[in-house]
From Swiss-Prot:
Species for this entry: Deinococcus deserti (strain DSM 17065 / CIP 109153 / LMG 22923 / VCD115)
Gene designation: rpsR
Reported function: Binds as a heterodimer with protein bS6 to the central domain of the 16S rRNA, where it helps stabilize the platform of the 30S subunit.
Bias type Basic residues, positions: 12-22
Gene Ontology MF terms in the entry: small ribosomal subunit rRNA binding; structural constituent of ribosome
Name of this protein: Small ribosomal subunit protein bS18
Length: 92
């Protein structure tokens, strides 16, 4: 005896209720931060992932102009060995 799969029994996947997301605000536009110097490693680390990659705009919430400036600043800091190019990957 074979079982027939009834499509009415299945639940659609990924069709849950959508939560409204809080819009990301560019911290440079509101004056919270300023791209002043490549030597400010503490500020630059906010825009670098744990593995050392530059975070994309959708994660940082920066405008296109500020994303380009922060990327250039991070690259300068990497060349001067203030920031690492990659972090050591630790598998758990």
């Amino acid at each position: 005896m074979t079982q027939q799969s009834n499509s009415a029994d299945r639940k659609p996947r990924g069709k849950g209720p959508k939560r409204p997301r809080k819009p990301k605000v560019d911290p440079f536009s509101i004056g919270e931060l300023e791209i002043t110097d490549y030597k400010d490693v503490k500020m630059l680390r906010r825009f670098v992932s744990d593995t050392g990659k530059i975070l994309p705009r959708r994660r940082t919430g920066l405008s296109a102009k500020h994303q380009r400036r922060i990327a250039q600043t991070i690259k300068v800091a990497r060349q001067l060995a203030l920031l690492p190019y990659t972090e050591k990957l630790v598998r758990k």
